[in-house]
A protein has these predicted regions:
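A short, conserved structural fragment
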Residues: 49-59
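Short acidic, hydrophobic short linear motifs in intrinsically disordered regions
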Residues: 23-33
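Short amphipathic alpha-helical interaction segments
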Residues: 35-50
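Short alpha-helical segments that sit at the start of domains
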Residues: 1-15
Length: 92
């Protein structure tokens, strides 16, 4: 049986991908980095944007997503929580 990632784990993967791109990433980079389909990526980006974890911006006709301070705080807490759960063999 294949375990599916939780919504929180997907959020963490998206935010981590943006962070790895110096806090600013194109949707395609996020799509591959977080291993999501286009439809699921769109849904999660809208959710993260509406919650204030990321901001959508355009530059020279290209769309980027930028990590906000709230997103950085969430990612920091998520990373700590993930390490804690990993220590006990629990998958998020």
């Amino acid at each position: 049986m294949i375990d599916r990632r939780s919504k929180v784990a997907i959020f963490g993967d998206i935010l981590r991908t943006i962070e790895k791109k110096n806090g600013k990433a194109k949707p395609t980079h996020i799509l591959y980095g977080a291993n999501l389909s286009h439809d699921r990526l769109k849904m999660h980006l809208e959710s993260l944007t509406s919650q204030g974890f990321i901001e959508k911006m355009s530059e020279n006709g290209q769309t980027f997503y930028v990590l906000t301070n709230k997103g950085k705080e969430f990612l920091s807490g998520f990373n700590k929580m993930e390490r804690y759960f990993d220590a006990f063999g629990v998958q998020i």
